[in-house]
Amino acid sequence: MNYNHNQIEKKWQDYWDENKTFKTNDNLGQKKFYALDMFPYPSGAGLHVGHPEGYTATDIISRYKRMQGYNVLHPMGWDAFGLPAEQYALDTGNDPREFTKKNIQTFKRQIKELGFSYDWDREVNTTDPEYYKWTQWIFIQLYNKGLAYVDEVAVNWCPALGTVLSNEEVIDGVSERGGHPVYRKPMKQWVLKITEYADQLLADLDDLDWPESLKDMQRNWIGRSEGAKVSFDVDNTEGKVEVFTTRPDTIYGASFLVLSPEHALVNSITTDEYKEKVKAYQTEASKKSDLERTDLAKDKSGVFTGAYAINPLSGEKVQIWIADYVLSTYGTGAIMAVPAHDDRDYEFAKKFDLLIIEVIEGGNVEEAAYTGEGKHINSGELDGLENEAAITKAIQLLEQKGAGEKKVNYKLRDWLFSRQRYWGEPIPVIHWEDGTMTTVPEEELPLLLPETDEIKPSGTGESPLANIDSFVNVVDEKTGMKGRRETNTMPQWAGSCWYYLRYIDPKNENMLADPEKLKHWLPVDLYIGGVEHAVLHLLYARFWHKVLYDLGIVPTKEPFQKLFNQGMILGEGNEKMSKSKGNVINPDDIVQSHGADTLRLYEMFMGPLDAAIAWSEKGLDGSRRFLDRVWRLIVNEDGTLSSKIVTTNNKSLDKVYNQTVKKVTDDFETLGFNTAISQLMVFINECYKVDEVYKPYIEGFVKMLAPIAPHIGEELWSKLGHEESITYQPWPTYDEALLVDDEVEIVVQVNGKLRAKIKIAKDTSKEEMQEIALSNDNVKASIEGKDIMKVIAVPQKLVNIVAK
């Protein structure tokens, strides 16, 4: 009889719910383990089969750690603010709250049906005012610390959509949605000073147990580089152009400067002759996103301003150009171009027939830029020096002339924090009519997002909140001064920056979380999620955590000690699953047809957890067949315990059982679930080969299977005669001595030809080996009628019989 998954899974899910089996108690004296999933955005589509892969991995570890006696925190919640809900509301006229609530109900049902051991009493939802009260509170702390400020920033403004778009939402100067024209336009925005923490964010990566590739992505995003800031005087004016360069040693080869079209000096230094061309170029550049402008493959464009600067070391006059590949947001918004030794500058110089001066020997600058090492030439006092020595000397010379200094630069920009959208956390700031600005008093938090059916963009560049007078207009009760609330909202990243802290104390009305509880649970011991969050979410969360650490609110410098990225589950044809390809697999269907345990087992057995692997119906069926074999081994047709399960140990499974406990334990520690499952299969195969199976071994097996397939685990545990849940049963242990086989297989040869393979005890003497060999039927037949001349026995290896 195969097991009835629908019946069994429902039974145990109800049991766990009614008994609050997975409720985490704040027993601060017990050893702890905090296993965290990246909480999902509850979309209208519901869960897909990619979600359970990471969730199953953390669930296995959570269940395993409970059995090892750990106090486990394993929570779940919803990252529910953001554009898709707002877009749905705009398209349908429905309230994003209703849409979000309905989606969460679907997600929660699906997650519960997969048997994950979450403590639902700790559920959080970023759109719940009791949650975002603390998101707003953190913003106020950032503001008070000088880390939140208003700045005029060039943004992608789309008048037709009435909003600012991210770089990713702009393609070839038009909006991805609707194809409307997009312009670069300076607008006042809230910005968070993440750059203040750049060095810490970089240095502390070394202490984290994260994949090296992911750490490298963060290092590259922060992009720390050492070099020099250099000042070029603009000829015949008071102006100066400041540039940052990592190669100040090549300054004698700087034959022109390039400014971004938005650079503050452009309009004042451009000569009358070039004003029209410069203006036209600036207009064109404003239609492009930063991504388009810096695309290495695109053809270089630019315009001469008519102005010249003076090279501070050579004294030569150099032309000043503008070009859109230089961004105002990076460095100083200006570069010194050294075409002989930089590919991009070389391409630009060749296109516009500009001077190319070789200053490092070793290449042929007639054909290409030389970017290798070499001695300096045509470089005054730097001649003959190698790179490092020349860099040091160049900085020294610039400092002596007051024209430069050593400087560290970062690719990392401050975090543009405001969104002109409705469905987000209101920013708790009031702008007063006298030009001052204050945050909302903490005792008035949460500042509620007003309910409205008018959520279309305002058209002015402000968020739809600007249309709600009752929200916007305020009067100071003490002074009578009028003010306007900030109408921009926070980005979707805000709520996910700190949710792992709220899980620790989700119902606390007086503080973000109790300091003692934070001390007990932090840092997160295991965080599993997709690699798509490698930079932004993880960098932003680390930044907020470091600020909270400096404020004495959290006790650790880092939030997530160990991080792991699960791979992607592809469609059967090795393609990414997508609605348009029609190859998306709904977990609901699998739970119905094969069972949640089969889905969990299969996703863990597909291959290494971090690999991208194609879905296979055959593989799914194979996983179900394995669970059926386990069931049939232990349970009779009539549902009673098989008579094969006995209470006496005939030792036949000693070795394979102890090997299995060791292998599964070791593999769980390294998240090697696919090889752990292989070993469980080996054990079951061995059980089918023997007449009797020792009951404690089957109990140990069921304990190891239960974290992967918890419903069948609970059911088999009860069939084995236990009334309590398997959840908190002690994890099996193994005996080192029994891992080693006390038997060996020897070969028996007659006149050099193999005649038999025999298993014998390891400590069998030579004499006994000879006796055993000579009494073997095959050997007897081979030597019948012959005289035995010699018998050679090599302990634990072979017996060779010479007969004539």
From Swiss-Prot:
Record flagged with keyword Cell membrane: no
Subcellular compartments: Cytoplasm
Reaction catalysis annotation: tRNA(Leu) + L-leucine + ATP = L-leucyl-tRNA(Leu) + AMP + diphosphate
InterPro entries membership: aa-tRNA-synth_I_CS, aa-tRNA-synth_Ia, Leu-tRNA-ligase, Leu_tRNA-synth_edit, M/V/L/I-tRNA-synth_anticd-bd, Methionyl/Leucyl_tRNA_Synth, Rossmann-like_a/b/a_fold, tRNAsynth_Ia_anticodon-bd
Binding site for ATP: K579
PROSITE patterns per UniProt: AA_TRNA_LIGASE_I
Residues of the signal peptide: none
CDD domains from the UniProt entry: Anticodon_Ia_Leu_BEm (cd07958), LeuRS_core (cd00812)
Name the UniProt record assigns to this protein: Leucine--tRNA ligase
Residue window of motif 'KMSKS' region: 576-580
Single GO term (MF): aminoacyl-tRNA deacylase activity
Keyword set includes Aminoacyl-tRNA synthetase: yes
GO biological process: leucyl-tRNA aminoacylation
